[in-house]
Amino acid sequence: MGALLKGCWLLIIVFLFFSVHSLPSLAVMDRVPLTVTLLQERLSAPVLKEGMTTINLANLVIDIRDENKELQEQFYQQIQGQINRAKQPLGLDFSNSLIQGNFIASRLGLPTPLTKVALATLLSPTEEQLLQQDENFLFDSDEPVFNVTVFRGPVKLQRTVFMGEVDFSKTFFLQIVEAMEAKFSRESNWVESRFARVAKFTKANFMGDVNFSQSQFLNKAIFRTAHFKSITNFHRSHFTAEAYFDQTKYDKTADFTRTFWEKEANFSQSQWRDRPLFSKSRFLSLLTFRNATFEKSGAFRSSYFNGVVSFQDVKLLDQVDFSNSTFTKNSYLSVSGLAFDSDKAKILGDRGVIGQAIYLPTLTGNETVLRNLVRNFRSLEQIADANQIEYKTEKLRFQQLKQKLNNISVIRLINLTWVADFLHTSFLALLLLLSQDGTNFSLVFGTGIIIFAYFGCLFWLIDRVRRLTPKPVIPSRYEIFCMVTSYIILTLSGVFNILQSASRPLLTLTAIALILVPLPLILVIELYRRGRYHDLMDSSYFLQDGSMRQLRLLITRLPVVPEFPLFRDRYTPISWQKRWNWLNYYDLSLNNLLKLGFNDWRVRDRELPAIISFLVWYQWGIGIFYITLLIWTLSRTIPGLNLLIYLK
């Protein structure tokens, strides 16, 4: 009994399976050949579909080839006459019909001149308002008139098969167009067509060339899962609302040049087997190619982007060109999961622009993407863009480390295993703030100016302003004026440089202030609190090598006077009597910071407060870090010094 029941269930399942898969063939078998008599019957008895009066021409075989001249003439004349005579909009339903021969829409619709005078007698105020959205609409009747074919009612082409050429050029659809699963066997012409309502071409199959150039979609355009097997042309088309081209396939060149997209343009999961051309187009909102595949080179040259451009999980087999394109502050190129699946796969763009535009949300899962992007720009010798990608990589790494520190467990906190992560995070934060990971020379230069000016002024202060009583040891007013003025000018120039070049200038200035101000300030306050009562009060703490005056590179020297007597005799203190002696303190600071100067400056080792010695060594240590950062940044930003170009 159980075996019998199983057998019955198996037969039912097999029956249902074949029933479902035979529905399309049954639908084809149900098609009835259209005759003149049947045409008249259908025209005399329109049906009500979705609230609209519709001429029912569904499930027919409509033979309007030149060999069937009588039916061809009657077909166009009677349908057009019925539409023209109707006071209310009439829809056309060709669903599941097979149309043989060329299909010419202008012989079916209502011929309408786009002038205010003509529309007032032909259409309702609502329809007239829709037509006025056309850019060719003329309010002045003295200008040349632009004529269109108007379909006032909905046009249904669901599963319609067109065996010949289709011509919907210069056609204005005032109601919805439904062409789901329609098949266009030969060329289809939609040049300068207008869609006032939703245009649905879901799962449409375009076997021949399709031309939507200069068309306007005033409502949603839905081409989801459509298949374009020949040349596709949307040149100069205008999409006012959302456009859905997701899961579409393009077997040959697709021309979307000079198109205008006011809302979202969705090309996710699309397949481009030939060249996609989007040059000189304008995208005011989201443009997504998520999970798309580009088998040939794509062009987005001279395009304008005002929203997110998503290349997430895209597979590139050839280059994509963004040269001369504009990315506004609201736009960026998201490349999370981007795969370079060929040696020819590249992203092209303007130097210093495309690297800035690229965006990735996280480091996790995108390490390979970032390496490929760096290799991509280095192979193109676009060092600034390669450095920008590496800078963004380190920013993402910093965010990852910071998040890791924020989620420290109690056990790790007690065991101090977080210290290494903390030091790594702090050092990385410093690199990002002071040099953008060695990619911004202007930022490093501005930082150096501030450090150089600060310590020059600090050394002048502790050396020249020693005490007020009983015998004052202070500089002249002229010297004070020169030093303060020069310090302000140098510091402001460094700050201005940072404000211009840093991504987060306030944080950068804060980091510099934390390095320069707290510790030296505490030590200077302590120095003046204690007072100075040692010998040699009338002599400078800083000595110069007077044996020669020349520009010197003194990387290996230490800031203390030599011990050997013959060498010590060459060093003399700064002369306070000369009016320009304040410049020596800047030379000292430059020497201590960059190991470069016009004199070899040292600090004396007799009658020297320990605080002053510490401050000199403190700047010397900062100088080691700074000169390393400077050389590293120069090696990454000057192409001739960047050997990594040649070492992939």
What do the predicted segments below correspond to?
Residues 2-648:
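Terminal module of membrane-associated proteins
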